[in-house]
Each structure stands twice: as C-alpha cells, then as structure tokens.
C-alpha cells in the first residue's frame, strides 16, 4: 500500500498561475545571464580556457601534441614558453 508524502501533484504545480509568474521571469533571466557570461568572454577568464584566437600563436601554428612518453614535461614547458 502506498502512502501519501504530502507533496503537491505535479499537474497542480504546472497549472498554477504562481508557477508561471515565477518561471516566466527566472527561465529567461538564466538564459540571458548565460549568454552574457559567454559573449563577454568572462567564461574564458573564469575557467582559464584559451579564447578562439589564442589557440595558435604567430610563432607556433602547429598542434601542441605531446609525443614523448618520458620527456612530456619538457615538451609541455616548451609549449607554454611559446605562449
């Protein structure tokens, strides 16, 4: 026998005016905040990822591929020194 948890049924929640008043403001706000976060470049600064024009420098146009198993730290230092 199943019991009642005391929660409102989902159908009651999504058909209420209060739900749509709250979510008609929050959902577009979250979308706009995310768009601004990415379009202003703040996402690149926060997560430390390179911007699209910083993947390749003028002096290094090849892919920074680490090929050595035992000298990987030296190769990594060489790649970061070129930045």
Curated annotation (Swiss-Prot):
Topology in the lipid bilayer = Single-pass membrane protein
Q: Do you know which InterPro entries this protein is assigned to?
A: PSII_cyt_b559_asu, PSII_cyt_b559_asu_sf, PSII_cyt_b559_CS, PSII_cyt_b559_N, PSII_cytb559_asu_lum
Name the job this protein performs: This b-type cytochrome is tightly associated with the reaction center of photosystem II (PSII). PSII is a light-driven water:plastoquinone oxidoreductase that uses light energy to abstract electrons from H(2)O, generating O(2) and a proton gradient subsequently used for ATP formation. It consists of a core antenna complex that captures photons, and an electron transfer chain that converts photonic excitation into a charge separation.
Q: Which PROSITE patterns match?
A: CYTOCHROME_B559 (PS00537)
Quaternary organization = Heterodimer of an alpha subunit and a beta subunit. PSII is composed of 1 copy each of membrane proteins PsbA, PsbB, PsbC, PsbD, PsbE, PsbF, PsbH, PsbI, PsbJ, PsbK, PsbL, PsbM, PsbT, PsbX, PsbY, PsbZ, Psb30/Ycf12, at least 3 peripheral proteins of the oxygen-evolving complex and a large number of cofactors. It forms dimeric complexes.
SUPFAM superfamilies named in the record:
Cytochrome b559 subunits
The UniProt keywords, alphabetically, are: Chloroplast, Electron transport, Heme, Iron, Membrane, Metal-binding, Photosynthesis, Photosystem II, Plastid, Thylakoid, Transmembrane, Transmembrane helix, Transport
Biological process GO annotation list?
photosynthetic electron transport chain
Query: What GO MF annotations does this protein's record show?
Result: electron transfer activity; heme binding; iron ion binding
Q: Which family does it belong to?
A: Belongs to the PsbE/PsbF family.
Transmembrane ranges? 21-35
Required cofactor(s): heme b
User: What protein does this entry describe?
Assistant: Cytochrome b559 subunit alpha
Q: Where in the cell is it found?
A: Plastid, Chloroplast thylakoid membrane
Q: How many cofactors are bound and how?
A: With its partner (PsbF) binds heme. PSII binds additional chlorophylls, carotenoids and specific lipids.
A Pfam family for this UniProt protein? Cytochrom_B559
Query: Domain of life of the organism in this record?
Result: Eukaryota
What are the top taxonomic ranks of the organism? Eukaryota, Viridiplantae, Streptophyta, Zygnematophyceae, Zygnematophycidae
NCBIfam families this protein is in? cyt_b559_alpha (TIGR01332)
Q: One GO term of the cellular component aspect?
A: photosystem II reaction center
Tell me which residues bind heme: 23
